[in-house]
Amino acid sequence: MSKGIILLAAGGTGGHVFPAEALAYKLKERGYSVHLVTDSRAERYAGKFPADEIHVVPSATIGSKNPIKVARSLWTLWTGIRAARKLIRTIKPLCVVGFGGYPTVPPLLAATRMGVPAMIHEQNAVMGRANKALAARVQAIAGGFLPENGGTFPEKTVTTGNPVRPAVIEAAKQPYVPSVPDDPFNLVVFGGSQGAQYFSKAVPTAISLLEEPLRKRLRITQQVRPEDMETVNSCTRKLEMGADIAPFFSDMAERIGAAHLVLCRSGASTVSELAVIGRPAILVPYPYALDHDQAANAAALAATGGVKVIPQAELTPEKLSTILRGAMTMPDKLAKMAAAAKQAGKPDAASLLADMVEAIAAKRSIQDFKGAGV
């Protein structure tokens, strides 16, 4: 028999859905029913989500200065809050947990107005706009990188780390095996769950600058946008190299586990998964983020020595080619980076976050939770 329902709310990108998925597995293990409320974008990421039910409520972001668009967004938001109130009255959750993204705003606002215990989890080192708007209203804030002794609400913030999915925990069991001269070198390239156009242009050019013996060693897994598939595939065929190119890989954790080097953006989930699995990486923060959250995430892991951070403006194909050449000829250096990254990982983040959810659902104060250390 279920202990009750926990309602998780997450925006429809992998960065929001994946940590919610990790928590959902942990809560199910502890006997709770889990419902997910999200938007239509999450469909591609929610295939393995262990939710008893998935709900979609209307929501919108208010980013335009056009008064007509603002009015439409406000109406959609109001409609979403009404739908969320109806959902909460129907399923009667013990607690509502938000993971960021504008689709979390209606259910979290509805919960706080209805007196239902609510909390948020912020994956990044800098709080996102949706979570920032909700932070004052909820009982507790869990953070992937947020410090407990800083920020606006230190008294109700707990640094749990970012929960990672079971597939990541499984991949972490595989030790890092340094590359061997003349053997295949596995390079994994991705730009977060939505891909990165920049890598689609820079990586093939950089590889073309490598000497033929090095180029023939490369085995590349690269996530690209659908519109870039043909171009990237054409480049890899011309270079006569082993490549697996796709818009999305459902087994990305396993592929990272098999990598000698990872080249990627530095979203919170990505950084956390790299650390738990323990793989060396070149992080290229997304340069147009409003709050520069990816740069802050990257800096947190770079401080351990597990990754190198290079701004996109500085990473020319020539520089990337030089980096790849060095990585393929200095396996000991990558092995040290892998060990440093793994030491920074928090594989128990999902358990700590589940402890926190249970405390809030039981209407314990977050101060009591922090004081008890349980």
Curated annotation (Swiss-Prot):
Topological relation to the membrane, as annotated: Peripheral membrane protein
Main location: membrane
Annotated binding of UDP-N-acetyl-alpha-D-glucosamine, by residue: T13, G14, G15, N124, R165, S193, Q294
One Gene Ontology CC term in the entry: plasma membrane
Keywords assigned by UniProt, alphabetized: Cell cycle, Cell division, Cell inner membrane, Cell membrane, Cell shape, Cell wall biogenesis/degradation, Glycosyltransferase, Membrane, Peptidoglycan synthesis, Transferase
Entry coiled-coil feature ranges: none
Domain of life: Bacteria
Catalytic reaction list: di-trans,octa-cis-undecaprenyl diphospho-N-acetyl-alpha-D-muramoyl-L-alanyl-D-glutamyl-meso-2,6-diaminopimeloyl-D-alanyl-D-alanine + UDP-N-acetyl-alpha-D-glucosamine = di-trans,octa-cis-undecaprenyl diphospho-[N-acetyl-alpha-D-glucosaminyl-(1->4)]-N-acetyl-alpha-D-muramoyl-L-alanyl-D-glutamyl-meso-2,6-diaminopimeloyl-D-alanyl-D-alanine + UDP + H(+)
A single GO molecular function term of this UniProt record: UDP-N-acetyl-D-glucosamine:N-acetylmuramoyl-L-alanyl-D-glutamyl-meso-2,6-diaminopimelyl-D-alanyl-D-alanine-diphosphoundecaprenol 4-beta-N-acetylglucosaminlytransferase activity
NCBIfam families: murG (TIGR01133)
PANTHER family: GLYCOSYLTRANSFERASE (PTHR21015:SF22), UDP-N-ACETYLGLUCOSAMINE--N-ACETYLMURAMYL-(PENTAPEPTIDE) PYROPHOSPHORYL-UNDECAPRENOL N-ACETYLGLUCOSAMINE TRANSFERASE 1 (PTHR21015)
Protein name: UDP-N-acetylglucosamine--N-acetylmuramyl-(pentapeptide) pyrophosphoryl-undecaprenol N-acetylglucosamine transferase
Annotated source species: Rhizobium rhizogenes (strain K84 / ATCC BAA-868) (Agrobacterium radiobacter)
